[in-house]
Structures are given as C-alpha cells and as structure tokens.
Amino acid sequence: MDAPIKAPTALNTEKARALAVALAQIEKQFGKGTIMKLGAGEVIEDIQVVSTGSLGLDIALGVGGLPRGRVVEIYGPESSGKTTLTLQVIAEMQKIGGTCAFVDAEHALDIQYAQKLGVNLQELLISQPDTGEQALEIVDSLTRSGAVDLIVIDSVAALTPKAELEGEMGDSLPGLQARLMSQALRKLTATIKKANCMVIFINQIRMKIGVMFGSPETTTGGNALKFYASVRLDIRRIGSIKKGDEVIGNETRVKVVKNKVASPFKMAEFDILYGEGISRLGEVLDLGVANHVVEKAGAWYAYRGEKIGQGRDNSREFLKENPALAIEIENKVREALGIPLVQAAQGSAEPEKAAKPEKVEKADKPVKAVVDKTLAAPLAPVAS
C-alpha cells in the first residue's frame, strides 16, 4: 500500500527558502541561467542531427543521424571506410548550409576523392598541423568561434605530442598522447556543446599483448575519448563487391558501440563503391525489401507490381536514372520506419508523379522507362 502524501511542513518550507537563497547566490556569482529547474524556462528542443549519408546507419543511430554539439568517435581497421564515412557527413552538413573543418593530422587527405563524394572544397576549411598540441588548439579556437558546425580530426593516432617529435627515436615516453587527449577533451566538451558543433575523431585500432580473455583490440589515445564520446561507431569491411573479376567496392558493417542519445548496439550494413562513396540507392532497395515496400521475386525487383530491374545492380541503375521514383520508395521506407521524410529536389516532379516502370507481359528483358528531363535532378538532402 502506498504511503499517504504528507502536507507541507515547516521543515519543507525552510528547505525551499534555503534552496531559493542558494540559487539566487549562484546566479549572482555566475550569471543568470547557470542553474535552473529542468521544467522551467525555455522548452527543451529535440536533438539536432546530421545525416551520415547512409539511410541504414541513420536508422541504427535512433535519432536520424549524428548529434550536433557532441563528440563522436569512428574507429576501425585500415581501409574500412572511416574517412569515407566522415567525408559523407561533411557533404551532408554542407548541404544544409553548415561550415565544416578537416584537421588532417595524417597529411593524407585525397581532395579529388572528397570532391567525388560531394564535398564542396571551396567551402571546406583544412588544416595540416605539425603537432598534436597544435591540432587540438586549432580545434579549440574553431569551436570557441561558434561559427563552425562540424570538425573532423583524422586521426587520433597521428596527434603526436611535441615532446615525442623533439625526442630521439626509441625514447620511452609513456602516456603522453593519453594525457594530451584527456586534457584537450576536458577543455573542449563544454565549448562544443555551447557552440552546437559536432567534433568527430577518427581513430585506429591496436592489439593489446597478453590478453587471454575478451577482445585484444583497443583504440589509441587512452580512455578519455571513450568516456567523452556521445557516439562511438565501429566500422568494418566484411566483403568485396565485384563486377566480373574487378573489385569495385566494399561491403561494410557499422556497429553503434556507444550511444548516449538512443539505444546502442544496433548495426547497419551498406556498400561503399570506389569513387562514389556510400551506395544510398542500394540501401533503399535493401531496406525496401526488408520493409515490404519493394517486392523481390528471384532476381527481379518490383514496386507496386511493376518490375524495376533484374538483379540488384540493374535495379540500382534504374533508380539512379529515375531520382523521383527513388525518393518515393525511400519515403515509403521512412514512413514504415517512422522517421522524417526526404523532400523532393526543386524542379523535380512530385513523388506521386514519378516515372514508373512500364508493365511487361514477359519477364525476359529488363524494363526500360522513358524519363522526363525534369526528373534528372539529384536526390535532395535528408532533412535533419
């Protein structure tokens, strides 16, 4: 049986007065808004997010993308797609008018590849610092300006402390990088939140020696980043995509290892095509089949009873030639999953009027549809 609710007593009144005095003193010393009741004042806004460029990963993150004003860590083995994923995030941020910076500590950014992924090089800020301290000071200055929306650091392993650079080869300097990262993150976290700036750290994997139980894998830079990161993504290459004997891309799996804004431990799989980046249309097909928006019978894919292609590659090419139809299918998938819809590009037809495959009586040839020139506009960015 629940205990009866007690009426306010003199003791409770005294506690309320003492609390009011303490709050007034704190606001006088540190400024208005330093402390307040969570239900008072302004309405708490929903988490602002930026798409990753992958529909499946946006869904796995639970909020439709990566959160702004937070620290994010993306780690994985070599050539697993870490830099590609961050460049896609930069492209998505630029589509909604955000200012982005890339701190290239590895001195290995391929600007031609970045451009192919949709990055606007004219608007991208880039820095190639000499030391780890210099790199993190640059990040601190950019976040304090309040004018930058996204900063990518590639990578934590390349943030070499100045003392290590000035020392001799073979010098033992334990813990220098870990202390550097710990100090920097203590300093940066509050500023990142106030500036609503997302900071993405790319990290590498190392093997711990003598581990008998559990995974021997660990990330560089100590434990501070593990604690301060709101989202941690583990990205792995799980296979190759071939066209004949030629390898044209990687099958990639991303696991949400840590997530402070939604449920963790979800996974997403997508294709990364060389020279193109994440195959969004391939994801639309796969998620369409999984959510019963697209029908699949044998090798044939169909939408609303109309065949759109034989085989995944042919169907993906058909959607590439018919962007309005691709938007329509993607919105059906988004509607089924309960996430915000994507808007059609200006100058394109409405999704309901999108070009549809012609009906065929015989299924011996791929369907060819006549597409109006006005439907050739690219897919619109995902609304964050």
Swiss-Prot record:
GO MF annotation: an example: ATP-dependent DNA damage sensor activity
Domain of life assignment: Bacteria
Record keywords: ATP-binding, Cytoplasm, DNA damage, DNA recombination, DNA repair, DNA-binding, Nucleotide-binding, SOS response
Comp. bias (Basic and acidic residues): 350-365
Gene Ontology CC terms: cytosol
Main localisation: cytoplasm
CDD domains linked to this entry: RecA
Positions with a binding annotation for ATP: G76, P77, E78, S79, S80, G81, K82, T83
Pfam families given in the database record: RecA, RecA_C
Region (Disordered) location: 346-365
GO biological-process terms attached to the record: DNA recombination; DNA repair; SOS response
Subcellular location: Cytoplasm
NCBIfam families cross-referenced by the UniProt entry: tigrfam_recA (TIGR02012)
Function: Can catalyze the hydrolysis of ATP in the presence of single-stranded DNA, the ATP-dependent uptake of single-stranded DNA by duplex DNA, and the ATP-dependent hybridization of homologous single-stranded DNAs. It interacts with LexA causing its activation and leading to its autocatalytic cleavage.
Family in the record: Belongs to the RecA family.
Protein name (record): Protein RecA
Organism name: Polaromonas naphthalenivorans (strain CJ2)
Gene of this entry: recA
